[in-house]
């Protein structure tokens, strides 16, 4: 259902997930980003975020998640769209998800994205190259192993702080510096 229409697009609610749609008025690409969720509407559910949102006959690719979208919600699982390019800070902070597949389209994973996801045991990066991965797995106490993409432009500190059961990490081939606070 449409929440609000504005000159540059609209805000649309699809099963408790709010998408902000932007038109390409200035030569840029039309796109959508996820702005917030209704915590009670997504509780206990397997969330599938579509690659596109169609509104007034136009398809908008879902390219970003902004802010702490699912933070603190009781989502059961989430499937991210293959059009997503960036996952924001604290997007899944302290949720009960058990695994996450980061689509090949994602170039940036911001800090604290999976902070405190105590049930998280599996992380899959579908891409072989990423621009940035920031400290995103802090306090994931059941995370045992992670295999990063072959090449990552930037990895920041606090990546695995508090991951007490971590036994194996396969770091990118091109990594030239490991921050002392990475683990």
Walk through the language-model features, giving the residues of each.
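Low-complexity/repetitive intrinsically disordered segments
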Residues: 1, 177-183
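Short beta-strand/loop segment at the start of cytosolic alpha/beta domains
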Residues: 3-38
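Generic hydrophobic alpha-helical segments
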Residues: 32, 132-133
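Extracellular, surface-exposed repeat architectures
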Residues: 37-40, 136
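Structural signature of tandem-repeat unit edges
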Residues: 23-25, 41-64, 72-86, 95-108, ...
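Conserved "repeat-terminator" motif of extracellular CCP/Sushi domains
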Residues: 1, 136-137
């Amino acid at each position: 259902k449409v929440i609000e229409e504005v000159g540059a697009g609209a805000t649309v609610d699809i099963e408790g997930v709010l998408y902000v749609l932007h038109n390409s008025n200035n030569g840029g690409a039309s796109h959508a980003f996820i702005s917030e969720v209704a915590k009670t509407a997504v509780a206990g559910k397997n969330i599938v975020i579509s690659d596109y949102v169609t509104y007034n006959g136009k398809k908008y690719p879902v390219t970003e998640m902004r802010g702490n979208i699912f933070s603190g919600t009781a989502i059961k699982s989430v499937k991210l769209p293959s059009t997503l390019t960036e996952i924001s800070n604290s997007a899944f902070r302290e949720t009960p998800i058990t695994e996450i597949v980061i689509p090949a389209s994602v170039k940036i994973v911001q800090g604290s994205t999976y902070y405190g996801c105590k049930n998280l045991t599996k992380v899959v990066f579908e891409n072989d190259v990423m621009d940035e991965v920031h400290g995103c797995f802090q306090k994931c106490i059941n995370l045992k192993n992670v295999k990063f993409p072959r090449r990552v432009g930037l990895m920041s500190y606090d990546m695995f702080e508090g991951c007490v059961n971590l036994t194996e990490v396969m770091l990118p081939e091109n990594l030239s510096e490991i921050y002392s606070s990475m683990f």
